[in-house]
Amino acid sequence: MLQEPLELSAPLARELAPQLCRRDPQTGESCAWYHGFWQYARLLGLGTSPVGHARFLAEAFGELAVSLKRMQVLIAGAADYSMLAHVLAACRSHGIAAQFTAVDWCETPLELNRWYAQRESVALDTLCSDLLDALPAGSHDVLCTHALLGHIRPADRPRLLTNWRQALRPGGRVITVNRLRPGSPDVPAAFSPVPVSWLNPSM
């Protein structure tokens, strides 16, 4: 089982987040509290990440490896480097030569991805962009996401899927994991102001 270097990346994320995290243009809120804390939450065994779906990712890339030994992989949205770590491990285990691009609207997870890529001596392109804006068109064989749809308003999801389709080459695949909450309101899950205030001293 892949062991991510969380003990090293947690203090790095905490340091980077106040410097790199952006403010939402509509609310003025920064995502620094989230990106700065997320690695520590994972160290405590809280939340979900690709580590819980490593077997699924390995099997999915194993199926692709039957017919495709070289591929362009787009990681669409990233809380940290976990998706890159597990997709890279899956590709290596199946002898796939992959080139990676990570897209997110915040520089903190992109910098964490660059940090991990450098540790693993793997080439990585990054793009700081909203996933609802245009993605690099028609250049990728595989698009990967994890727990993304809950962060996208239902009204915006058709546009997101259109961008996914345009980012993929003909016959390209989407490999994704997303939690389903039957019977719950179709809104993003969110923290209440109280725990947020614990993590953000400025509040």
List each model region and its residues.
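Local beta-strand N-terminus motif with an aromatic residue
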Residues: R70, H140-D141
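Short N-terminal helix/helix-N-cap motif within the alpha/beta-hydrolase-1
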Residues: L84-A85, I152-P154
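Non-membrane alpha-helical structural segments and their capping/turn regions in soluble enzymes
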Residues: E107, P154-P158
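Short catalytic micro-motifs in class I SAM-dependent methyltransferases
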Residues: A147-H151
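A short glycine-rich, Lys/Arg-flanked "PGG" loop and its adjoining helix->strand segment in the class I
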Residues: P158-P170
